[in-house]
Swiss-Prot record:
Positions of transmembrane segments: 9-29, 32-52, 75-95
Organism the protein comes from: Legionella pneumophila (strain Paris)
Keyword flag Metal-binding: no
Similarity comment text for this entry: Belongs to the MscL family.
Gene name in the database record: mscL
HAMAP family: MscL
Name of protein: Large-conductance mechanosensitive channel
UniProt lineage: Bacteria, Pseudomonadati, Pseudomonadota, Gammaproteobacteria, Legionellales
């Protein structure tokens, strides 16, 4: 089997495609969360702290500038993204559980077979 054919089979497997879609959606979701944090949450936090721009907070040690505010903002970004993904997964799991708990509709064939079984059981008990 050629290398190109093997790669094509690998790439067309469902889990690889699912992973690619998840990565693209994750990047898009990250942009949304970053906009939320940068545009809404951090300015509100800055207002609560007296109008301070948290991302710009830093201190200098010798010639090195330690940008701890930027680090703090990235930690907050991570926490919000992780929490949002957690909530999304919980919602998906809840919907899947609901779907699994729903009984399958009884087809006419199954209903007929059930009636035949019940009739046979009643007739055999009379013998």
């Amino acid at each position: 089997m050629s290398l190109l054919k093997e790669f094509k089979e690998f790439a067309m497997r469902g889990n690889v495609i699912d992973l690619a879609v998840a990565v693209v959606m994750g990047v898009a979701f990250n942009k949304i969360v970053t906009a939320l944090v940068d545009g809404i949450i951090m300015p509100c936090v800055g207002l609560l702290l007296g109008g301070i721009n948290i991302a710009g907070l830093s201190f200098t040690v010798g010639d090195a500038q330690i940008k701890w505010g930027s680090f703090l903002q990235n930690v907050i970004d991570f926490i919000i993204v992780a929490f949002a993904i957690f909530v999304l997964i919980k919602l998906i799991n809840l919907l899947q559980r609901k779907k699994e708990n729903e009984p399958e509709p009884v087809t006419p064939e199954i209903q007929l077979l059930t009636e035949i079984r019940d009739l046979l059981a009643r007739n055999s008990s009379k013998i």
